[in-house]
């Protein structure tokens, strides 16, 4: 019964929740305050948004306008502008020392001197959240990294992502910021690309390097869960962003956009997603009960 009570209080018009509210990214104190927000689902994530991808009705919202670092969720926009540029996906790109992360010192098995096609780099960036792959995509963009980032921000503006800023292509910078409202818009746009749908949801992928075959797995453990029908997804993590997850998934008879930001603990975002799925199945099993746009 609690779920039915929740629905009446959280079902909002998509346009109302998605209105632009310019904010600075919260610090530690503000992030702690976000977690104290009224949340009948008791989600671990500081920020959550669940919307019907077809009717654009918001089924659940928790701090949806808060602006936070988004970590590797950034890579979706990196791939979007790469695909929209119409670049040769079979062009071979060499990993260089410019792709090494000296900021967070993250590790990578893509060694300088290794060669991969742009298609392979897109696959690794989306599925395995490979930072050097995303860096190489930005570096090989026409005009270089700066031009790629500029286009990412232009694309965000064209999608009315008014609380979003991109500083680089991997998500390692805390200056890559957005809100759940904006990220939902990005996911809805990204799902139009068959390559993003396929590559982001592949459970595993292998590439050949000078040292042999490199095997990668999807960073989202829900991909292998038969109870989930995930169409687009991306995970993200840096300390300043917490554990993040965005998905477009079919739950029951509904196509949903799910955004979760700033969860604590490696499994918390997935547990939140499971709780959301149970909530939607309990209170909103059919799109027939909702007006369409």
What spans do the regions from the language model cover?
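N-terminal secretory targeting signals
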Residues: 1-47, 51-57, 278, 282-293
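Generic alpha-helix initiation/capping and coil-helix boundary signal
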Residues: 2, 6-8, 118, 149, ...
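Hydrophobic alpha-helical segments and their boundary regions
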Residues: 4, 8-9, 41, 93, ...
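A residue-level detector for conformationally permissive "hinge/kink" positions
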Residues: 5-7, 48, 105, 163, ...
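Secondary-structure junction/capping motif
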Residues: 16, 105, 117, 144, ...
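Active-site-adjacent loops and short helices of periplasmic peptidoglycan-processing enzymes
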Residues: 25-181, 185-194
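Domain-terminus/edge residues, biased toward the C-terminal soluble/receptor-binding domains
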Residues: 161-165, 173-293
């Amino acid at each position: 019964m609690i779920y039915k009570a929740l629905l009446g209080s959280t079902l909002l018009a998509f346009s109302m929740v998605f209105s632009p509210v310019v904010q600075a990214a919260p610090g530690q104190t503000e992030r702690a305050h976000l977690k104290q927000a009224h949340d009948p689902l008791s989600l671990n994530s500081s920020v959550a948004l669940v919307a019907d991808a077809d009717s654009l009705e918001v089924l659940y919202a928790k701090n949806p306008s808060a602006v936070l670092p988004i970590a590797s969720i950034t890579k979706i926009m990196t791939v979007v502008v790469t695909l929209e540029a119409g670049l040769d996906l079979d062009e071979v790109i060499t990993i260089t020392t410019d792709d090494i992360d000296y900021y967070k010192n993250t590790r990578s098995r893509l060694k300088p001197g290794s060669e991969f096609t742009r298609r392979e780099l897109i696959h690794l960036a989306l599925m395995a959240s490979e930072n050097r792959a995303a860096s190489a995509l930005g570096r090989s963009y026409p005009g270089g990294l700066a031009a790629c980032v500029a286009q990412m921000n232009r694309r965000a503006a064209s999608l009315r992502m008014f609380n979003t800023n991109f500083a680089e292509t991997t998500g390692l910078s805390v200056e890559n910021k957005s809100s759940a409202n904006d990220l939902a818009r990005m996911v809805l746009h990204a799902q139009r690309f068959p390559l993003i749908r396929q590559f982001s949801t592949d459970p595993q992928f292998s590439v050949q390097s000078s040292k042999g075959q490199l095997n990668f797995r999807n960073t989202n453990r829900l991909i292998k869960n038969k109870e989930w029908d995930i169409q687009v997804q991306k995970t993200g993590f840096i300390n300043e962003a917490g554990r993040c997850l965005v998905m477009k998934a079919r739950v029951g008879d509904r196509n949903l956009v799910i955004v979760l930001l700033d969860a604590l603990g490696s499994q918390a975002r997935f547990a939140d997603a499971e709780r959301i799925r149970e909530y939607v199945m309990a209170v909103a099993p059919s799109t027939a009960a909702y007006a369409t746009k």
